[in-house]
From Swiss-Prot:
The chain crosses the membrane at residues 11-31, 194-214, 219-239. Keywords: Cell membrane, Cytoplasm, Cytoskeleton, Endosome, Membrane, Nucleus, Phosphoprotein, Postsynaptic cell membrane, Synapse, Transmembrane, Transmembrane helix. It comes from Rattus norvegicus (Rat). Its main location: membrane. The gene is Tmub1. This is Transmembrane and ubiquitin-like domain-containing protein 1. SMART domains: UBQ (SM00213). It is found in: Membrane; Postsynaptic cell membrane; Recycling endosome; Cytoplasm. It is a multi-pass membrane protein.
């Protein structure tokens, strides 16, 4: 039996839930508006500015009563507060100071020298490209008997002193672009060539289809037989084009 005659129970429950939600929404809106219209923050904000004004009037009255006693304290505070910005300026100057360039003496086998200017963040490769453009692959740099072979290493990581000597060896022939293979190893194929195996697989599949067509002729209508013949002709032409001498 329905709660209300002529109206289903589902409709009654739905309207009841909507009514409850409406009541809750109205209650929340009423509490929100009352909190936003609370006059307490305004009164606290108006009372706080009164304190500095009272303090200023008290200071002015003290100055009027004893002007001679206040002036020494002001003179004493002025110079003590002045060196603070100077300390900040001196503390901020070291990060802004630029790094000094490195002066390098490049000494060749014939005892001739060449002065190069570089920065600590420059790499060995950039130094070669700058001083020997187009011949950086032929140049070898040696420092204190150690070959500087890593072109990505920076000059700052070597801790080079100013006006240090780097021995340069310039070879007459360009080195191979790829490292040579170790003895006893021969370069083999890079991988399995799938293209060379595709045609034999297709031929094997074609032979299997022709075998099924001969053994099970009723399952192959005329259209399937003609398609198989055309596929055979196309594959034969492809094989002839690939393996033609």
């Amino acid at each position: 039996m329905a709660l209300i005659e002529g109206v289903g129970d589902e409709v009654t429950v739905l309207f009841s839930v909507l009514a409850c939600l409406l009541v809750l929404a109205l209650a929340w809106v009423s509490t929100h508006t009352t909190e936003s219209t609370d006059p307490l923050p305004q009164s606290s904000g108006t009372t706080t500015p009164a304190q500095p004004s009272e303090a200023m009037t008290a200071i002015d009255s003290i100055r009027e009563e004893a002007p001679g006693a206040e002036s020494p304290s002001l003179r004493h505070r002025g110079p003590s507060a002045q060196p603070e910005p100077e300390a900040g300026v001196t503390a901020s100057t070291p990060p802004d100071s630029p790094q000094e360039p490195l002066l390098l003496r490049l000494k060749f086998l014939n005892d001739s020298e060449q002065v190069a200017r570089a920065w600590p963040q420059d790499t060995i490769g950039s130094l070669k490209r700058t001083q020997f453009p187009g011949r950086e692959q032929q140049v070898r740099l040696i420092y204190q008997g150690q070959l500087l072979g890593d072109d990505t290493q920076t000059l700052g990581s070597l801790h080079l002193p100013p006006n240090c000597v780097l021995h340069c060896h310039v070879s007459t022939r360009v080195g191979p672009p790829h490292p040579p293979c170790p003895p006893g190893s021969e370069p083999g194929p890079s991988g399995l060539e799938i293209g060379s195996l595709l045609l034999p697989l297709l031929l094997l599949l074609l032979l299997l289809l022709w075998y099924c067509q001969i053994q099970y002729r009723p399952f192959f209508p005329l259209t399937a037989t003609l398609g198989l013949a055309g596929f055979t002709l196309l594959l034969s032409l492809l094989a002839f084009a690939m393996y033609r001498p």
